[in-house]
Amino acid sequence: MKRIVHIAALLALCLLASCGTDREHLLKVYNWGDYIDEDLIPEFEQWYEEQTGETVKVVYQTFDINETMLSKIEKGHEDFDVVCPSDYIIQRMLNEGLLLPIDKDFGNTPNYIDANVSPYIKSVFTKIADGGIDANDYSVGYMWGTTGILYNAKYVDPEDARTWDVIRNPKYAGKIFIKDAARDVFCPINIFLHQNQLKAGEVTMDELMMDSSDESLEAFEAFMAQVKPLVAGWEADFGKEQMTQERGWLNFTWSGDAEWAMMEARDLGVDLRYEVPQEGSNVWFDGWVIPKYARNVKAASYFINFLCIPENAIRNMDFIGYVSTVTSAEILEAMSDDELEETVDVRYLFGDIEGADEAHLDPTLYPDASVIERCVMMRDWGEETPKLITTWSRVKGSNANAMTMVVIGLFFAVLLVLGIRKKFFSKRRRRHYRKK
């Protein structure tokens, strides 16, 4: 299917060229699969002409892992105009000089980027780059979330789920699924293993996110050696379905996947809940950037601005199932649910918008300020990254349980192809795989 999509995109380029469409009137977008409401694409083309008096045709292509996208730009010098990497790749591209600044002078068109992107997201983005560069000049946040524990309240004590130590609790042996994402697992566990140093003020959370020391990697590997016999599978995408079917009781996962699973589980009468453990965790972000080899920088900037219109952000959230970095009164109202008894303080995200201090929002998608206080953004390790990847390979090793779950995953894939599980596709609640 990916090959078909790629070929279709190339054919589209050839067809447009044969029809006399100049490159300056094309906008090449490179994004994750299922990561935008594609009805917005033709709407953008019309909106762009209304705003600028110029025509543009979007050529839309998708990738499945960050490294595929990065390689095409870094080594292949492909002329994508706007792409959507994850946080650590944005940092790497900035440090390697692969990004162009985003022009936010839109003339008579409102600057929706500066008006609507969360102040919290902007503050976090200032920490991405080295050398005093403000990443907000080169990137705009798109979606974000946390990493935590999804658990079945029927089998798992909620108190157990409040700590990362739950994944080595023998009570849940054979019922634990862990994301096959080295950085997303290492960083929270490294925080857990350094609790004494954190409490003593000997180290900060930000420092732990950049900790690639041999001592920490060895401690992580030793911890995971105790976890491995309890693990049913290392998963990139199928863990949430195992949770909804009660084949799994614990899932080390992303908030968006957790939300998808909880929605599906409600229909099945399964009580799934999500917790960001008390020791702390990481927040992840994806954002839009303009690569240095782009050939339609103007349309790229307008495209990013278009996606920051609250109505469009709401549509993307509804389609994708993740949380937009765009925050406004309209979004707060649209995402509120008065049936939720507990409220969350999301002033860190929405600023001084009325009602943000006691908002009736889903805490899985919109964590309370008290949760965010113990979360930090992951950073790129640069040349140290291979050390983590090597450690992670040893952690997983060869595992009969993991292989069993791969077989189960393939079985469900066949069912999907046959259309037996169309329900899961209809909601599009899937998170792309953030390879670390």
Residues covered by each model-derived region:
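C-terminal motif of bacterial Sec signal peptides marking the signal peptidase cleavage site
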Residues: 15-18
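Early extracytoplasmic/lumenal segment of secretory-pathway proteins
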Residues: 20-96, 397-405
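Hinge/lid segment of periplasmic solute-binding proteins
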Residues: 61, 67-70, 87, 91-144, ...
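Ligand-binding "clamshell"
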Residues: 94-102, 134-136, 261-276, 338-343
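Periplasmic-binding protein-like
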Residues: 110-112, 218-226, 268-292
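Ligand-binding pocket segment of bilobal, Venus flytrap-like solute-binding proteins
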Residues: 175-178, 185, 189, 198-273
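Mature extracytoplasmic/periplasmic domains
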Residues: 291-371, 432
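Conserved C-terminal helix/tail region of periplasmic/extracytoplasmic solute-binding proteins
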Residues: 357-436
